[in-house]
Design a protein with these regions (language model features):
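Sec/Tat signal peptide C-region and signal peptidase I cleavage site
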Residues: 9-14
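Short, acidic, small-residue-rich periplasmic hinge/interaction motif at the N-terminus
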Residues: 16-59, 98
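Short, glycine-/polar-rich solvent-exposed loops and beta-turns at beta-strand/coil boundaries
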Residues: 27, 76-87, 108, 114, ...
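N-terminal periplasmic accessory domains that precede
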Residues: 33, 66-69, 89-92, 104, ...
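Extracytoplasmic beta-strand/coil segments of soluble accessory domains associated
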Residues: 67, 71-109, 131
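Outer-membrane beta-barrel domain signature
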Residues: 80, 140-144, 170-172, 207-209
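Short acidic/polar hinge/loop motifs at secondary-structure boundaries
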Residues: 109-137, 156
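Transmembrane beta-barrel wall of Gram-negative outer-membrane proteins
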Residues: 165, 172-203, 208-247
């Protein structure tokens, strides 16, 4: 259609060379790309899932790893080398091992690139920096490959803390287990920036003989927020010193 219109217009201009040329009123607007992600399940899709908020985790968050905190959910079985839920722990969902449980933190894959498992011992007390958790049982919504065959575990880290605060918490438990956690936030500053963080230390002798754990962790988050923008930059990590329970127990 546009081809024939062009010919007709050309003929008209050729017959009337003195006619006034009308400028094209069309304008071109270049739009930025839009990225759509589908990590979390909702009620209107056929996926079995459980949502847990920070308030749901708080009564159980006494220093144990995230798999142990999820042990009461349907279809979940957890393991602990030391027997106390601290140190090397594992999770199975509907009989599927950790290599088929896709773990994401803020939508970013966290599974080990070689073994496809997740070493929770490197994230001690990470539950203290989690805003919400969603566990999808069975094939889920993850876009990160075949690791979501068995289940998907989505972790959402701390939301923006608008008020300044500092908090020190300590927990004591069996087998000489001690957890100390320091959390803080600057609140929203003049330009919309916020700095928050967490420092944690966990020590436990473990239920199994010679299964002690000495764990340190940090989490720092910087955010910028205004009416239309939210930018987060975060860094976290941990250091673990564990005894020889990794090698199992001798039959004798």
């Amino acid at each position: 259609l546009s081809f024939f219109l062009f010919l007709n217009l050309s003929v008209l201009l050729a017959q009337e060379p003195n006619a006034q040329t009308v400028k094209d009123s069309l304008t071109t607007i270049s739009l930025e790309e839009v990225l759509l992600t589908g990590i979390r399940a909702k009620e209107d899709i056929p996926v079995t899932f459980t949502n847990l908020s920070r308030q749901d985790l708080a009564p159980r968050n006494l220093g144990q790893d995230i798999p142990i905190l999820l042990n009461y959910l349907p279809g979940v079985v957890t393991t602990s080398d030391a027997g106390a839920g601290i140190g090397y722990t594992g999770i199975r969902v509907r009989g599927t091992d950790a290599t088929r449980v896709n773990v994401t933190i803020n939508g970013i894959p966290f599974n080990d690139s070689e073994s496809q498992g997740t070493f929770w011992v490197n994230l001690p007390d990470f539950a203290s920096s989690v805003e919400a958790i969603q566990l999808q049982r069975g094939v889920g919504t993850s876009t990160n490959g075949s690791a979501a065959f068995g289940a998907s575990l989505n972790l959402e880290t701390d939301a923006v803390q608008e008020q300044a605060y500092a908090m020190l918490a300590s927990s004591l438990g069996s087998f000489n287990t001690i957890k100390n956690t320091l959390r803080f936030s600057s609140g929203i500053l003049n330009e919309g920036f916020t700095l928050s963080g967490r420092l944690s230390q966990i020590n436990s002798e473990g239920y199994v003989d010679r299964a002690a754990s000495n764990l340190d962790a940090y989490y720092f988050q910087g955010t910028f927020k205004d009416e239309t923008t939210l930018i987060k930059a975060l860094v976290f990590g941990g250091q673990e010193i564990t005894y020889q329970s990794w090698y199992g127990l001798d039959p004798d």
